[in-house]
Amino acid sequence: MKNLAQAVAISLIALIAISCKSTKETASSCTNVESSVKWTPQTEPQILASIERTACYGRCPMYKTTFMDNGEVTYVGKGFVDKIGTYKTLISEEDVQFIKSNIIEYDYFDLDSLYPTPITDFPSSITEVNLNGKRKKVINRRTPPTNLKDFEKFLDSILKGKELQKVSDETNYDTKAK
């Protein structure tokens, strides 16, 4: 009986020792794996700039172009434009940098947020910019300063000569094309 008790005690001690060693090795190997894998956060592309031309009582072009900081561009033509629907293209890194430098050159962040008009028939040009953590939206109804008019013309000119791929017939600016 004494031998049986000793055998059980030795077996129990051996099992405990083996299980402790196994746990230590597992914990240590997990730590090594975690320390060898470097996590790099993935960021979603951010809107860099956009321009929207709104309706009037006549035949005013209605569209919105959105430029992302990774070069993706989405154009949504709504009415009185050659391309109706949602289109996409890519612009070069140089074009993205040119947009950024023009935001600064045209003093976009110094503009007023609204250039109003009491006349209801006038279309609006709505520009938005997001640069270095600063965001600004400007609604131009009629009497903007020269630098805002020039910035709007600049944004409109970027897609000239670019090949746009139609991705849907959707004309809602707030819906992301798939």
Where are these regions (language model features)?
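Sec-dependent bacterial lipoprotein signal peptides
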Residues: M1-I18
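Short, well-ordered, aromatic-rich surface patches in folded extracellular/luminal domains
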Residues: N3-A5, C20-Y57, F109-K178
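An acidic/histidine-cluster motif and surrounding catalytic segment
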Residues: C60
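A short, structured beta-strand/loop element
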Residues: T65-Y75, D121-P123
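Short amphipathic beta-strand/extended segments with alternating polar/hydrophobic composition
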Residues: T66, T86-I91, K134-T143
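A short, structured loop/turn motif at beta-sheet edges
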Residues: D69-N70, L90-F98, V129-R135
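A mature extracytoplasmic/lumenal domain signature
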Residues: G71, G79, I103, L131-G133, ...
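A short-motif feature that recognizes glycine-rich, charge-decorated loops
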Residues: Y75-D110
